[in-house]
Design a protein with these regions (language model features):
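Helix-hairpin-helix/helix-loop-helix acidic hairpins
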Residues: 73-80, 84-141
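C-terminal accessory module of base-excision DNA glycosylases/AP lyases that mediates lesion recognition
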Residues: 1-44, 146-149, 156-223
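Short, solvent-exposed loop/turn segments at secondary-structure junctions
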Residues: 90-92, 154, 218
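Structure-specific DNA junction-binding interface
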Residues: 1-98
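Short acidic alpha-helix initiation/capping motifs at coil-to-helix transition points
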Residues: 56-62, 126-130, 192
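Amphipathic alpha-helical packing elements
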Residues: 137-152
Length: 223
């Protein structure tokens, strides 16, 4: 383990004095979601996910999004997953919802999301990340790394296999704990983050999936 990764490990041990969070706790991480805000911002004429009209769920958990991400075969499936992922990522804050809904106005967004889902399940995380950056073949205008890494994570984490790294979410809170700038991450930075997370997992909670590390980095928020 290099010195910078060891510094991050020390931060996590301070933030979690009782030990690393359990994988079940991570999967149970949930947020209330602002259905009415999403209804107002969903593009007219676009396929409308049933969740917008359902009154059943008042919160969305990681587990819920992972389950929906297991099978995405059509553009409609991709839009349903995007809504669930973005609802989990924004909660009830109107400004955050407005930002997350903006990419849906882009032409061909559903087709690109479907392609990105497939890429996340078959390619190395950093390669998929590079394709979703500005200038990449899977670039969606107004969809930045803090959100498209959520897409890569939910699409590809459970599809990880031996020899291929598992994708993780990288946002400002995670970056702050890493001691990084809170924006402008390159594909090589994302690859470095994935490698650091694996090293941190091996040193701190070797039996856990690496999203336990991402959750801990997010929760610590630079502490």
């Amino acid at each position: 383990m290099d010195a910078s990764t060891r510094v991050v490990l020390d931060k996590l041990k301070v933030a979690f004095p009782q030990g690393p969070p359990a994988a079940e706790q991570v999967r149970g991480q949930e947020f209330a979601w602002g259905r009415s805000q999403w209804e107002k911002r969903w593009p007219a004429g676009m396929y409308r996910p049933a969740a917008l009209d359902s009154q059943e769920a008042v919160a969305v958990s990681r587990r819920d999004v992972h389950r929906r991400a297991e099978r995405v075969d059509t553009e409609a499936d991709a839009l349903e997953l995007y809504l669930l992922m973005a609802a989990w990522g924004t909660g009830t804050k109107a400004r955050a919802i407005a930002r997350a809904a903006r990419p849906l106005q882009e032409e061909g967004v559903a087709a690109t999301l479907l392609q990105a889902h497939s890429a996340a399940r078959s390619e190395e995380p950093a390669d998929c990340y590079a394709q979703m950056l500005r200038g990449g073949s899977l670039r969606i205008k107004h969809l930045g790394p803090a959100f498209f890494t959520k897409w890569i994570y939910f699409a590809g984490f459970e599809a990880g296999s031996s020899g291929r790294a598992r994708p993780l979410i990288l946002d400002a809170r995670v970056a702050r704990t890493l001691g990084w700038a809170t924006w402008g991450w390159s594909a090589s930075s994302y690859a470095r983050y994935i490698a650091m997370s694996e090293a941190l997992r091996d040193a701190w909670c070797p039996e856990a999936p690496t999203d336990v590390i991402e959750y801990a980095l997010f929760t610590a928020n630079g502490a």
